[in-house]
Every structure is written in C-alpha cells, then in structure tokens.
Amino acid sequence: MPEISIIVPVYNVEQYLPAALDSLRAQTCPDWEAILVDDGSPDGCGALCDAAARQDARFRVIHQKNAGVGAARNAGLAAARGTYVQFLDSDDALEPQMVEVLCRTAKQTDADLIMFGGYEEHYAADGTRTGCTDIAPVLEGVYRGDPCPQLFPQLSAMSLVTRQLFRRRC
C-alpha cells in the first residue's frame, strides 16, 4: 500500500498536464500512487494519462463521463489505497520534495490533516518567468484540540483542498 495517494482530476488541460505528471515522477519519495481521473476530457488528456500509466505503475487511470471536478475527486478517493490522500490540480506541479516532506511530517506528528502553502509563478507571453507570488502564508506548528481564533485568517487562506494532506480511513 502506498503512503500517499495523489488524486488528479483531469479535464481539458492537455498543455499543462505533462508538467504535473513530470512533477510527480520527480518526487524524491517513491512511496506514492497517482490516480488520474480523466473526467471525459475532449482533448488528448486521456491518452496522456494512459501513457503515464503504461510507463510507470504508480499511475492509475480512471476514465469517466464528464461529471465535474467534485465527482472526479470522489472517484479518485474511492480508488485510493494510500494511508494519506492529497489532491493535485492537473495544471499545478509539486516541488520535488513535497511528498517526502508531507509524509515525514504526517508520521512525526501523527497528523490527520496537514495544511500547507504554495506559490504562483508568473510568465510573460513568450514563456519567460517574470515572478512568483506566495498565495498562502505558511503556518507552522502542530495544533491540537480547539483551534485558536487568531489562526482563522491564515487557515482560511490555506483552505483549498489542493493545499492539504488528509489521513484516509477505511
């Protein structure tokens, strides 16, 4: 059983999907599975997903009729085998150590939920990187019991499902 199941809903992102898949392949921790849910994408995404699964057994593919991102995530959850679950949007990419750091942190803290920040890269029309913006402040620490009211503004900034790791329970 993999430590982390990474669920990737896929729809009409043919130009971005290769970077997301490459970021998964580049992970320093090999103990993951990626569940690619092709949500009836009209472009070449289904073929890209199938090719990834043929090349690397850690990728699994679900093809379904278009039902929206929520249904795609739920289909991925139903197929997940990992101790933990993470969602990755198909036009995003993970830093190479992301899975390793999340896995280590989850084990060390016995966390049911880890929330983390991220950043957005900006590019000019010619593809030149022009900058980077922190899109969620990083809140470090282990919090147990009732959350402190002063944490709410920071927690709401990190409330995107793609900025969290969840313990999956059967």
Describe every region a protein language model picked out:
Residues 1-170:
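Nucleotide-sugar donor-binding/catalytic module of glycosyltransferases
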